[in-house]
Amino acid sequence: MPERLLELYQGLKKVIQRARPNEVAIEKVFVGASAQSALKLGQARGVAILASAEYNLEVLEYSPNQIKKAVVGRGHADKTQVMFMIKVILSLSEVPESDAADALAVAVCHSNLNLSSSKLER
């Protein structure tokens, strides 16, 4: 596990250096079926937060229900619905794999909520 966390950290740093984002969006930890899975997810989130902090990036967190609602229109959508809607929203040629769809869903959620709040500020 330490090697995978290091690989994640180094990969995130490369992405941050290349893409130069202003902020980072991540999913809040959902403690569901397995405490072990939640612990591993928490460790990965910690690495993402650390890499973001190193570059002074604001980290915004969204709950799974917020993400699903932003992508599908309802907070209790299933994974298949999220994957399909990501394909539609982003005009992809095929449905992305589960992990990629999850990451893209967080990005879509963040983008939608940012656009909404920007309009409210005007």
Predicted regions and their residues:
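Phosphate- and other anionic-substrate recognition elements at nucleic-acid/protein interfaces
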Residues: 1-122
